[in-house]
């Protein structure tokens, strides 16, 4: 992929996460977006931030204790630490926090 294609894919991924959160219509989750960022907040105030890092062509995911950097590999965003796939990992974090299954795919 070219740099331009990667940047487009970065934006499309964030838009897709936003669309899927919006479609869930879950009272226990709230989210806000701004240019290159999706901020997800649970009922108890815990925040998860998914952000575009254009300079490094990465997506970063942060939660109160940890943070992960995701690189594009074979059309998927894979974390550089534990090889987590972005959507599955975000689903797992939110599901664990809320105590119920969350699906973003």
Curated annotation (Swiss-Prot):
GO biological process terms, semicolon-separated: intracellular iron ion homeostasis; iron-sulfur cluster assembly
Keywords: Iron, Metal-binding
PROSITE patterns: FRATAXIN_2 (PS50810)
Gene Ontology MF terms in the entry: 2 iron, 2 sulfur cluster binding; ferric iron binding; ferrous iron binding; ferroxidase activity; iron chaperone activity
One GO cellular component term: cytoplasm
Gene3D superfamilies: Frataxin/CyaY (3.30.920.10)
Family that this chain belongs to: Belongs to the frataxin family.
NCBIfam families registered for this protein in UniProt: FeS_CyaY
Function: Involved in iron-sulfur (Fe-S) cluster assembly. May act as a regulator of Fe-S biogenesis.
Name of this protein: Iron-sulfur cluster assembly protein CyaY
Organism expressing this protein natively: Chloroherpeton thalassium (strain ATCC 35110 / GB-78)
